[in-house]
């Protein structure tokens, strides 16, 4: 066995090399095939996995739970009311306790420093299910979905539309640069990515040959796009900025006019979900009443169109998370990459 992944944590995309990320994407596709064919793959038989959630989730919790069970492991959910991270007990102390009881830890919350402390002090692999800075497990699902549709990654162009400072935008930018994917951020100047994130991405882009573009010009942003990607306009914990964001981001909505500007009939649309594309939710109705906006980051027309791949993308969360857990905890033979 070669120790390529065994015992390693996945806290941000930059933790792994291009070859390692490509391997995990391909390994995910393999595990997806095994799942579809009903072939058992209990690589984590007898392992116990802690799922720590400061932030609520549908897809991340469901993906980690089903992935762990498919791998033969036992997942244990610990929500915000079950854990005392930094409140009544330090993150260091919590990590040391959990590391003696569990074989691996997933964390979804606010602070990147917290997930880093869990990895530093637990002594077991820790996987970032989302923080305010990064969303690495989402990226594997996103780029697996892209590869499934185009058969490759290098040289493609992905355009992210909306809040260029959020965790998904950060992760798309850096991961794309590592993998040789051209990444355009289509966003108002007020929400351009932080300079240090852009600098990091540009460094990777020089190695991979990818192009990075940050712009508020729609024509420049989407010309030749293969993938249009968007996310919610207001992230968890920023609800007080809703009115400001609705007004600021309305011109960056993914609608059919923007799709047509790309001039690519094979284009696909991605969204990490949940999406506010209609008023069929309490939240959507409330926004419509307060702000007169019935569709936010994406129109219902695009969301339900032939371009949409977001439900494939959501399913791929499970397969890619499974690959990360198996590779870092399963004592598998993985040729050096």
Curated annotation (Swiss-Prot):
Pathway assigned in UniProt: Amino-acid degradation; L-arginine degradation via ADI pathway; carbamoyl phosphate from L-arginine: step 2/2
Stated role: Reversibly catalyzes the transfer of the carbamoyl group from carbamoyl phosphate (CP) to the N(epsilon) atom of ornithine (ORN) to produce L-citrulline.
Organism: Streptococcus pyogenes serotype M6 (strain ATCC BAA-946 / MGAS10394)
Protein residues bound to carbamoyl phosphate: 57-60, 84, 108, 135-138, 272-273, 317
Annotated residues for binding of L-ornithine: 167, 231, 235-236
GO BP terms, alphabetized: arginine biosynthetic process via ornithine; arginine catabolic process to ornithine; citrulline biosynthetic process; L-arginine biosynthetic process
Name assigned to this protein: Ornithine carbamoyltransferase, catabolic
UniProt entry tagged with the keyword Cytoplasm: yes
An annotated GO cellular component: cytoplasm
InterPro entries according to UniProt: Asp/Orn_carbamoyltranf_P-bd, Asp/Orn_carbamoylTrfase, Asp/Orn_carbamoylTrfase_sf, Asp_carbamoyltransf_Asp/Orn-bd, Orn/put_carbamltrans, OTCase_ArgI
Entry similarity comment: Belongs to the aspartate/ornithine carbamoyltransferase superfamily. OTCase family.
GO terms of molecular function: amino acid binding; ornithine carbamoyltransferase activity
Record key words, sorted: Arginine metabolism, Cytoplasm, Transferase
A Pfam family of this chain: OTCace
